[in-house]
Amino acid sequence: MKRVLTALAATLPFAANAADAISGAVERQPTNWQAIIMFLIFVVFTLGITYWASKRVRSRNDYYTAGGNITGFQNGLAIAGDYMSAASFLGISALVFTSGYDGLIYSLGFLVGWPIILFLIAERLRNLGRYTFADVASYRLKQGPIRILSACGSLVVVALYLIAQMVGAGKLIELLFGLNYHIAVVLVGVLMMMYVLFGGMLATTWVQIIKAVLLLFGASFMAFMVMKHVGFSFNNLFSEAMAVHPKGVDIMKPGGLVKDPISALSLGLGLMFGTAGLPHILMRFFTVSDAREARKSVFYATGFMGYFYILTFIIGFGAIMLVGANPEYKDAAGHLIGGNNMAAVHLANAVGGNLFLGFISAVAFATILAVVAGLTLAGASAVSHDLYANVFKKGATEREELRVSKITVLILGVIAIILGVLFENQNIAFMVGLAFAIAASCNFPIILLSMYWSKLTTRGAMLGGWLGLITAVVLMILGPTIWVQILGHEKAIFPYEYPALFSISVAFLGIWFFSATDNSAEGARERELFRAQFIRSQTGFGVEQGRAH
């Protein structure tokens, strides 16, 4: 039990990825034919959508942004589908199942970044950018260096996320469906490539929307059945859970998963600013027609996600009552069959029988596909748009850029499958924490200051951004998660599991210092360009909308 909790708590936003949701010990389950049939129905339906989307992808705008014609409501659902992962569902429910109230604190932690995105980023990002957040960061700064840094930040985050997601997918499918791990990884990789290769952002968007609807429906039904069991009384829910849980009343006490205030603060900052620096999330704001729709996207997405995380809290307590106290779901040693992360899946069986169990298992797989499709598209756009079309071959035609993007999708897919197989038995939970730390320490400071600080220069952004990225990586390696748990050293050089507090500080200080001391003519010119950028970011004047976007 302690190992499962440690692995879950040792990642910055463990629920941002399927990998860490199943980082504890898992046991392969018997082949679940109902789940497989339901999943095949989902795959056939989404491949049909991909075929439909492929007929409508005629240009670079269509491929990267679905023509800019996604509505705020649709994009809000898609963002929720991109952000709510299998770990959000299984991992958070498992945390509530084992630790009670602390699970709610973690689930709410994933929402704290969205007000930042709503009030500080969404509108200006849409008004200044076209396809990637590097468009915004390089708006008035030197194109080459800034795009290289932004693309590197994006690709590192995408790669770490993708590896962890593929390993998580293989283990999760082995656990839920009884399929072989290698078959599961190849299946996810091939489907991911097909969605992105042929359907681009339009297919990816609708896969994410469908997945979000299915996940919200499944979680709502489970929460409804749990509340029905206790007469729709939260008092009864908590009382019954405390009565059967081994920890008793202690499950209602907070503070059991974070050791000290610095770790808590660092974790919170990583969650908050990491979310605002995830390339596959930021890319979604270019799929809407204008800044107003971008704001609506965040509003709807936050509502859907907030509702979902409240449901996971109810599901977790429901699992304590209906699963934890039921010997049918325990093995001979008294442990939950399949591990604690199966709590929500067992609850699906308890409240809806085998048919609903199959549905929830299929939804968990669909969840993984939606997330990896978004990641792959973000990685491909960083290579084709930021590096190829704007650094290495300026003036490349749309056709050339799209060809590079699709080649990148194939390469990313093959690499993801190979690394997913190679990392099968490795502890990859730290990759999620590192991805969020880099997003918070490199991507976020550059995006924020490029839009809001008139004195930012290319020198400051480059040196500060690289310092933030390197600091996050080094501190993560020297911390307890990698240095002790993975490399086997006796004591960590850096005592905290979460580096975000320190790496973010280094990034902001570095950007400020090297920009403030930049007295070059180029730096002065970049400062003068801020006023024109500010006007466009506020008014949207000059922004192309809709299909022309």
Swiss-Prot record:
Biological process, per Gene Ontology: plasma membrane acetate transport; sodium ion transport
Domain of life: Bacteria
Any Pfam family hit: SSF
Primary location recorded for the protein, binned into one broad class: membrane
PROSITE patterns (alphabetical): NA_SOLUT_SYMP_1, NA_SOLUT_SYMP_2, NA_SOLUT_SYMP_3
Location relative to the cell: Cell inner membrane
Segments crossing the lipid bilayer: 33-53, 77-97, 103-123, 148-168, 183-203, 206-226, 262-282, 303-323, 355-375, 404-424, 428-448, 464-484, 493-513
GO-annotated cellular components: plasma membrane
GO MF, one example: glycolate transmembrane transporter activity
Keyword tags: Cell inner membrane, Cell membrane, Ion transport, Membrane, Sodium, Sodium transport, Symport, Transmembrane, Transmembrane helix, Transport
Membrane topology designation: Multi-pass membrane protein
Function according to Swiss-Prot or TrEMBL: Transports acetate.
HAMAP family per record: Acet_symport_ActP
PANTHER family (UniProt xref): CATION_ACETATE SYMPORTER ACTP, SODIUM/PROLINE SYMPORTER-RELATED
Family membership: Belongs to the sodium:solute symporter (SSF) (TC 2.A.21) family.
Listed name of the protein: Cation/acetate symporter ActP
Organism: Escherichia coli (strain SMS-3-5 / SECEC)
Organism taxonomic ancestry: Bacteria, Pseudomonadati, Pseudomonadota, Gammaproteobacteria, Enterobacterales
